[in-house]
């Protein structure tokens, strides 16, 4: 019954439930965790500190692969919580899930001022096409390794269309333009 109640909280919508979630998010229990996830999905920028606290607690409680992390990572990116960048960097490095790594890269692109010179470059070599796409959209091109990798991605007939579109949006039809 408890799990069903917590799941139903995530499906609720509207201002009254957000007001309640803001109060519950500070609780150190399952209701607090569910409230943090709800705020990550539907909250406003003012909810950033609560979402960040929920993200930190989820990492401490379940490690870098916990089920709550997906919505919290997405929320940190959606809300542009710059203070979440260190936690997101940790998750990017430590998660075993390539899909969560891709979502974390997207959140880092929105929260970490150093992303273009750091993790975005690493994203270009990731096994997940969505992560490579994030890297292609954001990696700083001052490094010759990045330029070479972007050219290879653009020329690779086996590369996913979304990745090639992202690369071409950066370099144009003439790959020598970089």
Over which residues does each language-model region extend?
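C-terminal, beta-strand-rich globular interaction domains
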Residues: 64, 124-125, 151-158, 162
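Short, 15-30-residue, compositionally biased linear elements
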Residues: 85, 113-114
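Buried hydrophobic core positions in alpha-solenoid tandem helical repeats
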Residues: 18-22, 50-56, 87-90, 118-121, ...
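Alpha-helical junction/boundary sensor with strong preference for TPR arrays
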Residues: 28, 58-59, 95, 127, ...
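Structural detector for internal amphipathic alpha-helices that build alpha-solenoid repeat scaffolds
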Residues: 1-14, 19-26, 30-45, 63-81, ...
């Amino acid at each position: 019954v408890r799990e069903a109640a917590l799941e139903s909280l995530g499906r609720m919508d509207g201002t009254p439930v957000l007001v309640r979630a803001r109060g519950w998010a500070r609780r150190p229990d399952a209701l607090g965790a569910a409230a943090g996830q709800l705020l990550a999905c539907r909250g406003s920028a003012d909810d950033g500190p609560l979402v960040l606290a929920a993200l930190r607690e989820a990492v401490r409680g379940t490690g870098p692969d916990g089920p709550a992390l997906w919505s919290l990572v997405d929320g940190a990116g959606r809300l542009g919580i710059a203070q979440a960048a260190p936690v997101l960097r940790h998750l990017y490095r430590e998660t075993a899930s390539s899909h969560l790594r891709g979502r974390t890269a997207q959140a880092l692109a929105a929260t970490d001022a150093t992303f273009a010179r750091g993790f975005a470059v690493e994203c270009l070599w990731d096994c997940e096409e969505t992560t490579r796409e994030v890297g292609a959209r954001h990696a700083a091109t001052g490094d010759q390794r990045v330029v070479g990798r972007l050219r290879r991605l653009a020329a690779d007939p086996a590369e996913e269309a979304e990745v090639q579109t992202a690369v071409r949006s950066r370099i144009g039809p003439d790959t020598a333009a970089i």
